[in-house]
């Protein structure tokens, strides 16, 4: 099945492969599919450095078997320079595939090359990456909202105790102060909490 996400023709890829003949074949397939090759790297250990240098839209890795070092590089990359990653390998061991996906690979393809297959793999990786990013950002948004809520609740309690007002009035005071300072309510609440901790000796 061909998955076509109508990727722009200026999409750039970083190619990682220590096999010269296979690397040349990948270059040909990727260019036939309309992708630009930002760079091709022979040493998988240079993955993070090469990504920071060339800033590709996605990364294509081809290897006989993904090494522990390569998987570590992928995990480090996805912490600092998140990109869709497509890994082609001759290793069809399910455990290896699971380790690769856990490290941050978006599409793991057992080698068997053709131009259409390479293009489909890249398209699928972009789709998987976007879905994963959407979920990751939603999780971060929820976690941030929960942290902010706890901060605001504590600040309201401090204001209520110090000023002898009810919860609604305390929140209104927080909101008004945030508006005057062009800050988020949680930021003002955090300032109040920090000041209270300093004055009461809480570390």
Feature map (PLM): residue ranges:
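C-terminal output helix
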Residues: 95, 113-122
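A short, hydrophobic beta-strand element within the central beta-sheet of small alpha/beta folds
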Residues: 82-92
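Short hydrophobic/Thr-rich beta-strand motif most characteristic of the beta2 strand and flanking loop
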Residues: 34-43
